[in-house]
């Protein structure tokens, strides 16, 4: 073989080997992902565990930088600024406020950092412009499942004009949609149903206080709908505190150990609709890797499974399969 051809072949071989080595090194490069959890309720503990488990089981090296915003928009903003300064590969978050979090998400996006929302996000215009993906259980369908369960209960108990109070989390559009779905199905099946009150009570202590006031101020109240986990457990405790167990039913959202125990008891809590925090965490991490690697398909809003629990056995089984207490 002529010397020139041999030299050319060797150079090509060296280039190939060098390219392979660089590719392997790039593949081994550690990714850094920021993760922000909205508050300290059990659902977000489940999401955190799901994200951590998925990161641990992933074939890529991932460093997670995590915090809990505790429902505080300024904490959320400050942490996102820290993540932007660190030049992380992506940010996972459940937005504190649809409108209030928009500037924060915009800053990250304009810095070239993809933002992946889960459960709650910024307004639709902001999602379209600044968010790479938004994972959520269809809130309208969520509410419809709960409305069907409530209708089953009222029909079975021959209550044709039930009075229902709502303890809400309607600072978030997902909660508004949950209620709309609930009302739509309930009123189609039980036309005499009335929503007689709708008050905010996302945090447990406030939900208990609101629930008790609603019970005292609303004669012949038949049921309370809780739009979130805190609202649900608060409603149950309010019913018990006012000695209305067996008289006022609760239809709720978001499973936790205490909520599962109440469903197993089935005296007050009659149905719960839930999106598993762990499953959400797994799904949002998987989608984040797709976004980072530019492998995401065209769908920006991604639906996750919604579960309905209505029986004593459902509560018992949930407790048996969630011994760590994380939803």
UniProtKB/Swiss-Prot annotation:
Domain of life: Bacteria
Major subcellular location class: periplasm
Entry's Gene Ontology BP terms: transmembrane transport
Gene Ontology molecular functions: carbohydrate binding
UniProt keyword Signal, yes or no: yes
Keywords: Periplasm, Signal, Transport
Signal peptide bounds: 1-26
Pfam families named in the record: Peripla_BP_4 (PF13407)
Cellular component aspect of the GO annotation: ATP-binding cassette (ABC) transporter complex, substrate-binding subunit-containing; membrane; outer membrane-bounded periplasmic space
UniProt-annotated location(s): Periplasm
InterPro entries assigned to the protein according to its UniProt record, in alphabetical order: Bact_Solute-Bind_Prot2 (IPR050555), Peripla_BP_I (IPR028082), SBP_2_dom (IPR025997)
Entry's family note: Belongs to the bacterial solute-binding protein 2 family.
Function: Probably part of the binding-protein-dependent transport system YphDEF.
Descriptive protein name: ABC transporter periplasmic-binding protein YphF
Species, as recorded: Escherichia coli (strain K12)
